[in-house]
């Protein structure tokens, strides 16, 4: 019996052997590896994490957990830092998390792919 993750997504592996939360994300990882091999992007990172810090203080949930954002991919394209998130279902906290990320990390371009 297949086990589904959140939102009925099936975990999948890309050709590079990374485990992803969905088939769509694994397909996008394969595409990005091809772009990197062709020299169109560089410094591809899988699942980078960004922690939200304001005025030198880490944002935390009431239970003490740090608040942050884990994207699917990060890479450099035409000299610009890009962090990319493959979205199937837009979850309810995404608009707020996106706004905080854009405000705290202005040197990154946040790209959403479907």
Region annotations inferred by a language model:
Residues 1-114:
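Electrostatic, structured charged patches in enzyme active sites and in nucleic-acid/phosphate-binding
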């Amino acid at each position: 019996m297949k086990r589904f993750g959140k939102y009925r997504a099936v975990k999948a592996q890309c050709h590079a052997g990374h485990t992803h939360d969905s088939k769509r994300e694994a397909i996008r990882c394969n595409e990005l590896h091809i772009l990197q091999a062709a020299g169109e992007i560089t410094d591809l990172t899988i699942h980078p994490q960004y922690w939200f810090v304001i005025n030198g203080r880490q944002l935390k949930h009431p239970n003490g957990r740090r608040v942050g954002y884990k994207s699917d991919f990060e890479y450099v394209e035409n000299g610009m830092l890009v962090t990319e998130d493959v979205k199937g279902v837009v979850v309810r906290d995404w608009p707020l998390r996106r706004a905080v990320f854009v405000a705290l990390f202005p040197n990154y371009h946040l790209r959403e792919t479907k």
